[in-house]
Amino acid sequence: MRWLPGLLLIASIGFHQSLADRVLVLGETAAVKDTHSVFLNSVKERGHELTVRAADDSQLALFKHGQLIFDHLFILAPGVQVFGGSLSPSEISKFVDAGGNVLVAAGSNIGDALREIAAEHGFEFEEAGTSVIDHHNYDQTLDSGDHTTLVVGKDQLISAELIVGNSAKLHPVLFKGIGLVAGKTNNLALSIVRASGTAYSYDPKAVRATNPSIAGSRTLLVGGLQSRNNARIVFTGSSELFSNTFFSAKTNSVNPSVQGAQSGNADFATAITRWVMKESGVLRVKTVNHHKKGETVPPVEGYFITEDVVYTIEIEELKNGKWVPFQGKDVQLEFVRIDPFVRATLKNSNGRLSVAFKLPDVLGVFKFLVDYRRVGYTHLYDVQQVSVRPLWHTQYERFIRSAYPYYASSFSMMAGLVLFSIVYLYHKDTPVKGAKVLDSEKKKN
């Protein structure tokens, strides 16, 4: 039996590894392990299994026998033109449709492959060779003179702590690369980091002067989206944003208010990857219950109109690898047939949200519907279908107070009919004496 503890240890290790998320990291060369080692190690330290490959590796694949081989895909290969193996932009779209999450980091030397991936998801990178330039917010130490190494302030970040972390404490972020724009019809697009109002996209090596294609805050430095199946994708125009150089650098902006501060690239990269890998902003429904007021279980025969009901739902949020009660106070319940007949905000008591209300005086098939959509969170959707019936004849009130005048008129009519009948049937007329004398005289004649 000496082998039993060892066997249990091996089994526990295998079980732990099976729970770890599998990440495929693609670089232009194997050098990405060195140039981005701090970033990759930070992801590995959070319990993920990383597989680093060249983007043109002939053995690349995301599916095997119809199943996902990896849970997440990081592309740190800006200049890739064609992926190796079975990998392609359409294959990556299938990966997202299957629930996989993607991080794409481009650069000024962007290739066609990354441009196609962005187009598949409602974004468009600028032309190859262009860079985002800002003459008022660049780093004086790292910049080569083109003013393309930008210092990004906290006011340029999206107001979503789940995605970018605590922006109030975040140091300026260094960015060098290409800009992108979100499609006008892309309703799912998130403008995670915008360029400043003085920035523009241009080719710094262009000999002939032309107007910038995009400028100002319309230029995105980092964009993303959460698809309808809750898969997450992040696009950035700077692979250097995740590099060791930018992680360890101190900002030396032309703006004196942000000089000398340690760059916030490491904290920003941690926050953005935690979000895209669904380590944060994930909700789930634990339990749902609805019943008549004063009872504890749903009625077998369904509900009846105008009954008082209580609806309760328990929601949990994933934080630091553990499911904890969700503390949101803006979750709403709708009681829907075709349109909502009732809409009420649920009261949160440490993750247990509830509301009591009266059913409408309308019969039919209804749904208890919770449809919670907030930036940074996964889409929470729960439906409980119930029937609402009319009252049985024995359930109606014997006398309705509002009908008392009609009751009174009915009873008064019946009483009047009885009195009239008595008078008519039992009243006898008294004969007139004069009439009898006249009758006797007529007989004599």
Curated annotation (Swiss-Prot):
The keyword RNA-binding does not apply. Residues 427-445 are cytoplasmic. The chain crosses the membrane at residues 406-426. One of its GO terms (biological process) is protein N-linked glycosylation. The keyword Nucleotidyltransferase does not apply. Subunit of the oligosaccharyl transferase (OST) complex that catalyzes the initial transfer of a defined glycan (Glc(3)Man(9)GlcNAc(2) in eukaryotes) from the lipid carrier dolichol-pyrophosphate to an asparagine residue within an Asn-X-Ser/Thr consensus motif in nascent polypeptide chains, the first step in protein N-glycosylation. N-glycosylation occurs cotranslationally and the complex associates with the Sec61 complex at the channel-forming translocon complex that mediates protein translocation across the endoplasmic reticulum (ER). All subunits are required for a maximal enzyme activity. PANTHER family: DOLICHYL-DIPHOSPHOOLIGOSACCHARIDE--PROTEIN GLYCOSYLTRANSFERASE 48 KDA SUBUNIT (PTHR10830:SF0). Component of the oligosaccharyltransferase (OST) complex. This is Dolichyl-diphosphooligosaccharide--protein glycosyltransferase 48 kDa subunit. The gene is ostb-1.
